[in-house]
Every structure is written in C-alpha cells, then in structure tokens.
C-alpha cells in the first residue's frame, strides 16, 4: 500500500525495501546476508573486467539504529571488495542523486521512511539511483536465504570514503529552469518547518535559506527521537499547525524522516492536503508551459521537450491531478501503486511530472525519485508568482475528498472472490485492474479503488468524490457488497 509500503515483516521484498525492527526481525546477521546478496546481484547485473572496481553509495536517515546498521552494511560491502562512498546523514533523494553524481554502481539507503523509530530497513538502488524492481528484490532475497558467502581476500577488500552530498543536491534543485529562487527571495516568505527530528532538519533549512525564506524550525534536531508519529498526516501535524498560526507564517512544511514526502499547512493552520502537493506542483509546471505557448505560438510538445505534456500518479491518488493536467490540454496516465511502478510509467510516456498522492513529487528534470526538496522549491516559486495566500491557492484546485477504509478477512482466498465480483458488478463503469480493482464513475467524478494488502488478509478501500459525504457513501456501498460476498 502506498501509505504503508515499509511496514513489512522481515524478508518481504517490495520494489523498495528489505527491513524490520532491528534486533527483532532485522538482525545484524540479516543485514550482512542482504548486503552480501545485493553485492552478488550487482556483479551479475553489471559485469566488469577483472581488476575493475565497484562503487556503492550508502546514506542514512537519523534513526537511532542508523549508525549500527550503517557500520554493518559498509563493513560487508568492503568485505565483498566494493568501494563505499559513505554519505552519512542524507535524505533518500540525496542518496539517489549521489549515485548519479558519483557514477556509482548502486546505492543503499538506511531508512524505514515514515515508520516508527524502532524500524529500520535497506532501500536498494541501481546505478541510476533508482529503486530495484520487485523481481530484482526477490532475486536478492533468494540469494540471501542460501547463506553461501564468498568474501574478497585481503588484497582486494574495498575502501571507504566519506562525502556529504547535501549542498550538491541543493545546487541541482536551484539550477532547474522551473525554480526561481530570486522570485521567492523577493516574496519574503516566512515558514515553519517540522522535520520530525530526522535528516530533513539538515537539508531543508539550508535549501530554504538559499532561497531567502525565513525558516522557523520545529523538531529539526536529527537525533532520531521522532517527536510525533512520523507519517505526515493531519493528525500528526497539530503542533506544526499551531506554530504556523502563532508565528504568522505564510506556510507550514512537514517532511517524513527520509524527506521524500512533503505535506503542507496553510497560513490559517489548516492542512493543504497531502494529495494536493503534487497537484499544485503539476498545475504550476503545466500552466508555465501553457502560458509560454500562448505567448510564443510554439506547441506544448515543443516547449515541454525532452519530456511530454503528460502526468502520472498511482491509482490511489486524487483525480485532481488528472483534472489540472487536462485543463491545460495535457494527458494523464495512472500507474500501479509503488514508486517504481510510477517511474516506469513516467519513463514509458516521457512524463513532465508525476508522483504519488502521499506528498511524493517526482520531477524527472532532476531525477526519477520522490523528492521533497524539489517539491518545495517548485511550490514556493509558484506561490511567489501567484502572489496569493496558500489557502487561496488550495481553493483554486478541483476539490475532492478521499475516504480510506479496509475490510479485514478471515481468509486470503476471499480477496480474489471479492475483487472478481466487483469487476462483474460494475462492468458497465470504467474498470482498471492493473493493481487490484479501480472503478471510475466518470459522470459523477468519483472512483473507488480496492487493493489487497501484501502482508495480511485485508482489502484496502479508497473512495474519492467531490464531497466527503459522496466519498463515504461510495465506500459504504462497496463495503456492503463485499460483506454480502463474504457471507454467501
């Protein structure tokens, strides 16, 4: 599920991550096995002539177990004869960028994203600084289970160098054509930042300072003692909302522990809506090209090159992205849930912008990964140009409400029965089954998405409509039908 992708038992492979709570399901021995298996598969994927070295970047968020996990991962890489670039405290997108900067063969990020502080995990990257896919992850798990080790001899051990990539990442964000730090500086914004005492507390204030933004810091000490549940949902952002109002700030900024998700708070203390982070950034990028096309007479395709005038999000994300894309004459495409599925679809159609409705912005002009830094830089540029309040900006977008529910089942076998029945019952509507079953009721601008959990006998149900009542009613209708099927 794109909202709790990382809360898995040990030895589950997703397109991202292998992990658990250290000492419980992610033991030091497991870390050695997984890292060794990663090295084995890396060599298979990128064969080199004898004597040629492999290089892997390792970065971590500020979790309490981070140093322990980092030492074991780096030691194992060295024992496998691989040279390590130790990036230290780094956001997930920074480590992804570091793989590109270093022209490395891969990367390992030590983070459990928005999970509670006792969790940690290894996120595995390829030579492009992008997540391995599910098949590659499964191959690594299979290799790890064999426990057959063949380490380097003493003359071919790897080396470790330390390097901080924070400023290079910020430089790359500020160098983007669509980012206008000067306009942001002139706007004189004051923001409150909540970085949940992780690595966002290092990179975000530095980026904001370079854009001339006054930044009031809340929970910005990267000690891994998360001040609240680290998932950037409204219930966890009460302290931030209060600080925005109390300080008379223009905006509240919340990031998760590894800084790939961005949630915003309006100047009145109300949530901007994490679904709307991506919507707002896309609206800015499309409107910018559209205005240039109007002024120059050039085509949208010409002006968005080398990308296409398209957007992508996953099936559980708000329809608002499709609406703003189509408003400017662009085309929207949906992908299965999971960052690697979104980026695969984006590459396939050459999207200008994409991401996930959980505050994950993917801007390929920088790199193919969710990145809160590029998200906030684009958002603030737009806010400076629009010269309006954040709450007014939010109201300018199509308004939708998402109801989130789940059905607990006694038997996993019922999942397919329910999903298949839904496809039959709603066959006259627009049905997408690339990832569970999504039924779109076009005339009413509403949809419902049923997805199986990877780890337990649960069906998650997301329903979206233009009003909260309509979303809840749609979810209720689907749950009612599911219960009848269960009781047959």
At which residue positions do the language-model features occur?
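An N-terminal, well-structured beta->alpha segment
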Residues: 7, 14-75, 79-80, 159-191, ...
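Phosphate-binding and adjacent anionic-ligand microenvironments
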Residues: 250-251, 290, 297, 303-488
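Gly/Ser/Thr-rich active-site loops/lids in small-molecule metabolic enzymes
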Residues: 133, 217-219, 270-289, 339, ...
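Gly/Ser/Thr-enriched, mixed-charge loops and adjacent short helices
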Residues: 120-247, 297
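N-terminal small/polar loop signature for handling phosphorylated ligands or for N-terminal nucleophile
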Residues: 40, 44, 55-119, 206-265
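Positively charged, low-complexity/disordered segments
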Residues: 1-10
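Buried hydrophobic positions in well-ordered alpha/beta secondary-structure cores of metabolic enzymes
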Residues: 11-12, 58, 95, 108, ...
């Amino acid at each position: 599920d794109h909202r709790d992708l990382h809360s898995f038992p040990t030895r589950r492979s997703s397109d991202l991550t292998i992990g658990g709570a250290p000492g419980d399901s992610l033991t030091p021995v497991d870390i050695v096995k997984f890292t060794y298996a990663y090295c084995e598969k890396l060599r298979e994927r990128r064969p080199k002539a004898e004597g040629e070295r492999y290089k892997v970047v390792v970065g971590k968020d500020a979790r309490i177990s981070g140093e322990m996990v980092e030492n074991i991962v780096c030691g194992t890489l060295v024992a496998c004869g691989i040279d390590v670039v130790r990036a230290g405290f780094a956001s997930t997108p920074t480590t992804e960028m570091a793989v590109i900067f270093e022209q490395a063969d891969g990367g390992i990020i030590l983070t459990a994203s928005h999970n509670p502080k006792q969790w940690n995990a290894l996120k595995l990257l390829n030579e492009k600084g992008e997540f391995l896919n599910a098949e590659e992850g499964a191959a690594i798990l299979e290799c790890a289970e064999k426990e057959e080790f063949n380490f380097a001899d003493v003359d071919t051990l790897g080396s470790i160098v330390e390097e901080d990539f924070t400023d290079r990442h910020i430089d790359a964000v500020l160098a983007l054509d669509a980012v206008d730090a000067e306009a942001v500086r002139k706007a004189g914004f004051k923001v409150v930042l909540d970085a949940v005492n992780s690595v966002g507390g290092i990179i975000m204030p530095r980026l904001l300072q370079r854009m001339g933004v006054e930044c009031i810091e809340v929970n910005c000490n990267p000690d891994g003692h998360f001040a609240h549940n680290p998932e950037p949902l409204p219930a966890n952002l009460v302290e931030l909302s209060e600080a925005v109002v109390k300080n008379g700030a223009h905006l509240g900024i919340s990031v998760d522990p590894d800084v790939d998700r961005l949630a915003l708070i309006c100047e009145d203390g109300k949530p901007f809506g994490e679904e709307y982070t991506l919507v707002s950034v896309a609206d800015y990028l499309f409107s910018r090209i559209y205005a240039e096309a109007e002024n120059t007479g050039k085509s949208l395709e010409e002006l968005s090159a080398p990308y296409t005038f398209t957007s992508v999000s996953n099936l559980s994300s708000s329809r608002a992205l499709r609406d703003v894309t189509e408003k400017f004459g662009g085309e929207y495409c949906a992908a299965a849930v999971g960052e690697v599925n979104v980026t695969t679809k984006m590459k396939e159609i050459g999207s200008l912008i994409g991401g996930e409705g959980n505050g994950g912005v993917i801007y390929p002009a920088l790199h193919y990964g969710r990145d809160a830094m590029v998200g906030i830089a684009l958002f603030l540029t737009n806010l400076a140009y629009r010269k309006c309040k954040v709450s007014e900006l939010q109201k300018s977008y199509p308004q939708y409400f998402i109801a989130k529910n789940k059905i607990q089942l006694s038997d996993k076998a019922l999942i397919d029965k329910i999903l298949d029945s839904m496809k039959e019952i709603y066959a006259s509507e627009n049905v997408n089954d690339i990832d569970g079953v999504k039924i779109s009721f076009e005339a009413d601008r509403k949809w419902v998405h049923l997805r199986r959990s990877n780890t337990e006998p649960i069906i998650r149900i997301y329903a979206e409509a233009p009003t909260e009542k309509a979303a809840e009613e749609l979810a209720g209708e689907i749950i009612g039908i599911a219960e009848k099927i269960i009781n047959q």
